[in-house]
Each structure stands twice: as C-alpha cells, then as structure tokens.
From Swiss-Prot:
Domain tr-type G residue range list: 10-209
Protein name: Elongation factor Tu
Molecular function terms from GO: GTP binding; GTPase activity; translation elongation factor activity
Binding-site positions, Mg(2+): T26
Family according to the record: Belongs to the TRAFAC class translation factor GTPase superfamily. Classic translation factor GTPase family. EF-Tu/EF-1A subfamily.
Length: 399
C-alpha cells in the first residue's frame, strides 16, 4: 500500500497547472500523480477523476477545481487543476486556491495561444510568483528546430509579462505517453521527463514563508467593552503572531491609531500568544470601544497602510451565476467587501472600454469613500444589495 508512506515532514507547497485549453493540463496532472504513485509518493488519479472537478464556492462564486496531492523526495504538494478557462480566471482572481507557483503547459505542436498569454498575465496580476514550463506533446513534433522555436516564443512571452523568461526552466515531454507508461506499471523514457519536470519544480519554486512567519494582521470582526479591563477586539488572525506587550496599529476607516496588547484570549482562556488561523480576543490598552469598528485591522506597526484609490483585476459574475443581468459603466458604485466589511466605491473603466458585461474579466480603477487597509494581492468581493456580483484582487495602489 502506497498510502502508508504519506508523512507530513516535508515542507508544503501549493501549485497548479495553467495554460491554453486542450494543451494537456489535466493529462499532465494525471501523469504526475501516476508517475509518482509508482514511487510510492502519490495515489494515482485518473484523468476522468480530475476532469470531473467538484464545484466549490469562494466569495459567492462557484468554481470547478480539482485538488490532488502528491509528494516528491523533498516536498509535499497540493496541486490544483481547473477544467474550464473561466474557472481558471475565477480561481486566480478569488484566490480560491492560492498558488506558490504554477506549471504552464504549452503544446509543442501548437505553441503559445491566447489563453497561454492570458494565464501568464493573470499570474502576473494576482501574484503567482514563479512559473515552470512543460512543453507537452513532444511526441507529435518531429522537427527539433520547431521545438526550439516554441521554447523561444514561450520565453519571450514570459519576459513580456515581467517573468524571468531566460531563466525559466522548460521541460519537454508527453503527458499522455508518460501516463500510458505509468498505467502499464513502469517509468520509462516519457515518465523520466515528468520526473525531470518535478525536479525543476522542487528546485525552482521556493518553499513559501509560513503564515505564522509573516507580519501580524487581524481583521476586526467585533468590539466589546469589558468593565475594569478595557476594550477587546475579536477576529481571526490572518497572518503572523501576536503576544501580550506587542505594539499594534489599528488601521482603516479612520486615522491610524497605535496601542499596546494587554491580553490575548481564546474561548475565555488567557493565551501567551495568538497565531495565524486562531480566533482570538485581543485586549487593547487605553483604546475606547467607539474608536474601533468592524472593517479595521490590527497589525504590526507600519506593515500595512490605509488606501482609497487602487487598480484591481476583477471577474464579473455571469447572469447564470447569479450576477447582474446588464452591463455596467464607469461611475458604477457597488460595495467592496474587504475582509470583514462593505465599503462603497466608484469604478472607472480602462480607456477604450465602454462597458463591462456579466462574465467578463477586466482591470478597473476603484475609489472608495473611506480608506481601508490594503496591499497588493488583497482580495475582495464586489456586492450590490447584499449579493455578490464580482470578485477582485488589488493589482496596483494609486493613493
């Protein structure tokens, strides 16, 4: 039984396959799991198993995604694959599956196609930090020069979107051939190429910083006043660690305030520290209940600042997904639900874009009526009368 070997000692990395439709993303996902299963490092997942992706809801948006897990000698991977192009766009914008790196699959027989470009652009905008390339369908290309030409095109395309095209690892192979070999029970010539790809992923995509190692941030969900003790704010710590005696800032909506943590509690028990993922109450020195409200954040001083105006990459829900039935134009004023609260803002469309239709993805400029704690990569929902009509991610801060 291969299952016994799964241990959690290896560092964990989230990756996914991206690329144009029919270039072989799902076949590659199946091939990776099949080849590694022969080494006792994964459970074999069939193509159909991955392709019939379950639907998930993230920020009110339904996305079909498949998650598979496997190990290499040095790491544990969670790998996400999406069946449809729209699912990729939604996945990347909502951050439903945060990727530490991606495997870009390009058919060697066809070269880069429109969605290849779009997925690279999206990776740049939503902050997928590293890309490794698999040139698939190598068995269909007889001409070595053609293969080199496709590789050159891919490198140029990556460089055009500010990825290091010249240094990006590119491995050629055939996912289908590797999968056929593995199903026959051996790792042959094509399986070796999949192992070579995974070796590149192991070495080129760095191990991500764990949430507890990042700077402290906790969105405020509720505020209480406790007689004789002061003000307690509650919420789930998004990242980092907070301890008694730490200086923190309260950021968003109003002027930034500084205070000191005098207590951290969880389920009414005193804690020495709270860390990423914990739901805690944080007692603040000298802070009045009316000075803090839902929608603000507690954070390490200087680590995040309040902003009103920024650019973001958004996906607008289609009518079938419960979104708007009609397009919207510049000056549309929905609510932007950031972390724990709705803030009204007005939208400016890019030059040359008259209107945005349900189902589109587009880059917009937003100006909020009050400032909130934002940084590159902050995700939020766009809502109208309490229902979600879109999702976005901050791609550039203006002021």
């Amino acid at each position: 039984m291969a299952k016994e070997k799964f241990n959690r000692t290896n560092p964990h990395v989230n990756i996914g396959t991206i690329g144009h439709v029919y270039h072989g993303k799902t076949t590659l996902s199946a091939a990776i799991s099949a080849v590694l299963s022969l080494k006792g490092l994964a459970e074999m997942k069939d193509y159909d198993n991955i392709d019939n992706a379950p639907q998930e809801k993230e920020r009110g948006i339904t996305i079909a995604t498949s998650h598979i897990e496997y190990e290499t000698e040095t790491r544990h991977y969670a790998h996400v694959d999406c069946p449809g192009h729209a699912d990729y766009v939604k996945n990347m914008i909502t951050g439903a599956a945060q990727m530490d790196g991606a495997i870009l699959v390009v058919s060697a027989a066809d070269g880069p196609m429109p969605q290849t470009r779009e997925h690279i652009l999206l990776s740049r905008q939503v902050g997928v930090p590293h890309i490794v390339v698999f040139l698939n369908k190598q068995d269909m290309v007889d001409d070595q020069e053609l293969l080199e030409l496709v590789e050159m095109e891919v490198r140029e395309l990556l460089s055009a979107y500010e990825f290091p095209g010249d240094d990006t690892p590119i491995v050629a192979g055939s996912a289908l051939r590797a999968l056929e070999e593995a199903k026959a029970g051996n790792v042959g010539e094509w399986g070796e190429k999949v192992l070579k790809l995974m070796a590149e992923v192991d070495s080129y995509i760095p191990t991500p910083e764990r949430d507890t190692e990042k700077t402290f941030l906790m969105p405020v969900e509720d505020v209480f006043s406790i007689a004789g003790r002061g003000t307690v704010v509650t919420g789930r710590i998004e990242r980092g660690v907070v301890k008694v005696g730490d200086e923190v800032e309260i950021v968003g909506i109003r002027a930034t305030q500084k205070t000191t943590v005098t207590g951290v509690e969880m389920f009414r028990k005193e804690l020495e520290k709270g860390e990423a993922g914990d739901n805690v109450g944080v007692l603040l020195r000298g802070t009045k209940k009316e000075e803090v409200e839902r929608g603000m954040v507690l954070c390490k001083p200087g680590s995040i600042t309040p902003h009103k105006k920024f650019e973001e990459e958004i996906y607008v829900l289609s009518k079938e997904e419960g979104g708007r039935h009609t397009p919207f134009f510049t000056n549309y004023r929905p609510q932007f639900y950031v972390r724990t609260t709705d803030v009204t803002g007005s939208i400016t469309l890019p030059e040359g874009v008259e209107m945005v239709m349900p189902g589109d993805n587009v880059k917009i400029t937003v100006e909020l009526i009050s400032p909130v704690a934002l940084e590159l990569g902050t995700k939020f929902a766009i809502r109208e009368g309490g229902r979600t009509v879109g999702a976005g991610v901050v791609s550039n801060i203006i002021e």
